[in-house]
Amino acid sequence: MYKVLVVMDVLEEHKVILDNISPELNVSYISNKVVKPEDLADTDIIVGYLAPDLLKHCKQLKLFQLSNAGTEGFTAEGVIPEGAVFANASGAYGLAMSEYMVGGILCLMKKFDQYKVNQPKHEWKDLGPVNAIYGSKTLVVGFGDIGNEFGVRMNALGSKVTGIRKHLTNKPDYVESLHTMDDLHECLKDADIVATCLPGYSETLKVFNKEAFDSMKDSVLFINVGRGTAVDTDALCDALESSKIAGAILDVTDPEPLPADHKLWDMPNVLITPHVSGGYHVKAAHDRIIEIAVRNLNHFLKGEAIENIVNMSTGYRDNK
């Protein structure tokens, strides 16, 4: 029998599914906020999120099914116990986060935020022309699961989509062109909407700097749902204050949480949310995380290949 420790929030319906996978699995549940080293010593499988420094206490770990898509903190040498398989939840978050992104863009494009300000004043006032997604050019930087799902939705609304990713793969039919990061600044020049879904690795640190913002149109909308560290916050503030870009939608920031006295809060052309585009805010995403875990638990029991195995050199999944 294998001991499975679930260290993530789950619904009762999720527990029913997990508890009935196989009599070979002894499944227990504990919050990752209170888990102790002694809880981990004889654990064979972990499902959820565990602070990287706690993994050293997992003396017989065979499978770590992370509930996140991002793997920051876990790929350094020695973090994952030797012999353990490490898989992430890539593929779970695209639906929820892409809808958030489209919603944020429409909010600023259609001036919903400004009309909401007028509402308490009972002010019936036409705020003039607005922009449209139809006919726009969208650049998606970080064209993985989340970026692709967002691109599909933007294409459906009539935007021409360009993608940038770490390594070139087969281009989806709906995408105008696919590039690597080497072409970032050139691609920025034509975009009306720039969306970044980049993870927080050293190679993505402050990719969006002064030079990047200077390459953008002054009418561009910038949206970040990846990691705040991919953006030079000072450069972003300068671009917004000088109207070098039209607006920003930020679900992630650097630093995070964003300090209460940070000037981004008071900028009228910025929409800020506290890292809520993913997580368990949309049940369908929560369900998808559990579905990935269930499939991999079954694969483990049958000796089959695990889905979403993380390449420890890149931090990305090697398979689907």
Walk through the language-model features, giving the residues of each:
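Rossmann-like adenosine-cofactor binding region
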Residues: 168-263
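An N-terminal-biased, well-structured beta-alpha scaffold segment characteristic
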Residues: 1-87, 209
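Glycine-rich adenosine-cofactor-binding loop
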Residues: 90, 131-155
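Phosphate-binding beta-alpha-beta segment of Rossmann-like dinucleotide-binding domains, i.e.
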Residues: 82-137, 163
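Residues at the starts of beta-strands that form the adenosine-phosphate
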Residues: 3, 26, 137, 159-160
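Rossmann-like dinucleotide-binding domain for NAD(H)/NADP(H)
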Residues: 219, 225-320
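Short, conserved loop/helix-junction motifs that constitute active-site signature segments
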Residues: 54-60, 77-82, 213-217, 239-243, ...
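Redox-cofactor binding/interface segments in oxidoreductases and associated redox assembly factors
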Residues: 6, 47-48, 66, 195-196, ...
